Amino acid sequence: MSAYRHAVERIDSSDLACGVVLHSAPGYPAFPVRLATEIFQRALARLPGDGPVTLWDPCCGSGYLLTVLGLLHRRSLRQVIASDVDPAPLELAAKNLALLSPAGLTARELERREQSERFGKPSYLEAAQAARRLRERLTAEGGALPCAIRTADVFDPRALSAVLAGSAPDVVLTDLPYGERTHWEGQVPAQPVAGLLRSLASALPAHAVIAVTDRSRKIPVAPVKALERLKIGTRSAVLVRAADVLEAGP
């Protein structure tokens, strides 16, 4: 793909706020929409070819990140895959990823309209209108986006390979667990980021780009060569290629 500089389209993300159309729950934070689209487009620019890609979030939590990218970048996507070691948030992720179809957005619009009539709150009607706008956009951009939801420990290469059976993600984009609201689970190695990268790379095609974000000044990936780094607000991000991770060794 052609070289990417930075996102120039200003995105009105109000329709994508947690709890408006997308489902939310305590303990599952949202992700900055502009940063999500910035990182995704940078990853696309690092791939060979120009066709639609498969996107995977192996620490998906509520599925918010994948759902937002699916709604904003339908034309660039072939499929999205969501996985997490904890099955608890996957129910919420399934509800959000169901919004990546016109039927799912229609159902959400009707739900919000019914709530507006029942409770007499303008905010519910506004949410219904947001669902309609998102449905119109998704339909115009290609319609329903295929999704898969699985349970897997991101530090278990065999489990990840099983999750991806029949699929070959081109882009991995995930927000690393942090602080008190989310945290690492599963068989966590002494160096979580390095372990995560090796585990992911072992299950990916060589050309795949792995993008991870964290609330830290700099995400450590050495000795792996970073394709690029960026920092927006409180989050840092780094992009690496699967082949480079494997070449760097354990």
From Swiss-Prot:
Its EC number is 2.1.1.209. It comes from the Bacteria. GO terms for molecular function: rRNA (guanine-N1-)-methyltransferase activity. Signal peptide: none annotated. GO terms for biological process: methylation; response to antibiotic; rRNA methylation. Keywords: Antibiotic resistance, Methyltransferase, S-adenosyl-L-methionine, Transferase. It catalyses: guanosine(2535) in 23S rRNA + S-adenosyl-L-methionine = N(1)-methylguanosine(2535) in 23S rRNA + S-adenosyl-L-homocysteine + H(+). This is 23S rRNA (guanine(2535)-N(1))-methyltransferase. The gene is aviRa.
